[in-house]
Amino acid sequence: HSVYVDQWDWEKVIRREDRTLDTLKRTAQEIVDCICDVSVRLNREYSSIHTRLCREMSAITAQELEDMYPDIPGGSQRENKYLEQHKTALIMQIGGKLRSGKPHDGRAPDYDDWALNGDILFWCDWLGCAMEVSSMGIRVDPAALDRQLTLSHHDERRDLPYHKALLNGELPLTIGGGIGQSRISMLLLGKAHIGEVQASIWDDETVSACEKAGVTLL
């Protein structure tokens, strides 16, 4: 991110029977399909754009990823290893501690259900690493919020208006997420730095490094 963060946030009301990993994966695939559709159209209309994205999304849990790469210590490093082969993936169930005793990545306890959330990532050949474009998930219901507040040692939030209403079952069940606008632009245009698609403020070190790499900052 730069100092300016731009993203689309969305939220959709669902039924209790929709609080499943299948719903999560199906929704994530719809987002991937939309991004890939735009990429195909851009490549067709602009001869200078040659980005190729993989529409086939692989879904894997954070625990499965740790089991697959036990010698790789960090979540982002395991993501890169996996995405290098699978190109497009949904990394699911982020927030709780894995069997190693460490979480894959941090997540707020009062947002997504840690058992029903995920990150959408694409592999970027021009960067040699994975890029996360969306963090999403089925939101906490009363049981999940109760559990996650205790696990994260944030029981003091229970008396806040939002938390109290949710714990009392007064709010609808939803799925939602955020989609990084500038990250999508970088992905579709094959750009190496967020400053190529977004006008912002950069320190001298970043400006110098980009000049040496031939990266034009807006």
PLM-predicted stretches and their roles:
Residues 1-15, 163-164:
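Residues forming anionic-ligand binding surfaces in small-molecule and nucleic-acid pockets
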Residues 7, 21, 28, 159-160, ...:
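Alpha-helix initiation and N-capping motif
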Residues 14-22:
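Inter-helical turn/loop segments and adjacent helix faces that build the functional surface
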Residues 23-42:
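Compact, glycine/acidic-enriched structural inserts
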Residues 27-33, 48-57, 215-218:
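Noncatalytic linker/hinge segments flanking ATPase motor cores
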Residues 36-74:
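Alpha-helical scaffold segments that mediate packing/assembly in large oligomeric complexes
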Residues 62-218:
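A translation/RNA-centric and nucleic-acid-associated enzymatic feature enriched
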